[in-house]
Design a protein with these regions (language model features):
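Extracellular and secretory-pathway beta-repeat/beta-biased strand scaffolds
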Residues: 1-163
Length: 163
């Protein structure tokens, strides 16, 4: 492919789809991608599609900076959307990613953070279902070839799982 995409601004597509694809994809500074809508979240693809499927071009390196936000929330009723951040080699994923179900009703969405060879992950991720009884939380798929948890991350993960 040989092309690079760097985004530092804001893109909004209420309930729609945003695709940032290329050989190297970077979301930097205070970049914002938002496909949230009142009745359900849309889809954001950064660097590839679900589990690296060849339906779209796949990035070798994907970076989501620490001040970046990616949102695919249902704002009122409806299900959270889908956020895929993917790289065939290295994914550096920081910032905030949300695919929440609606405040009144709706299930959480899907968030995938994957680097086939290397995944550097410090992102805040939320795919919950805050509204109504019987709503189901979403899915966070973490899919590197090798997964390393540092001691602080293990302690934080344990604390979250106990609450």
């Amino acid at each position: 492919m040989g092309n690079s995409v760097t985004h530092t601004g804001a893109i909004a597509a209420s309930g729609g789809t945003i695709r940032l694809l290329g050989d190297r994809v970077s979301l930097l500074d205070q970049a914002s991608l938002d496909v949230s809508s009142p009745n359900g979240g849309g889809t954001v693809l950064v660097g590839g599609d679900y589990q690296g499927r060849a339906t779209v071009p796949v990035a070798q390196v994907t970076t989501v900076g620490p001040d970046t936000t990616i949102r695919a929330d249902a704002l009122s009723s409806g299900n959270g959307g889908e956020i895929i951040v993917w790289a065939a080699e290295t994914a550096n994923i920081h910032g905030i990613l949300t695919a929440r179900g609606g405040a009144i009703a709706g299930n959480g969405g899907l968030i995938e953070t994957s680097g086939r060879q290397t995944l550097n992950l410090t992102a805040t991720v939320e795919a919950g279902a805050p509204g109504g009884v019987g709503n189901v939380g979403g899915l966070w798929l973490i899919d590197p070839e090798t997964f390393l948890l540092l001691p602080l991350a293990v302690a934080l993960l344990a604390a979250v799982m106990l609450t």
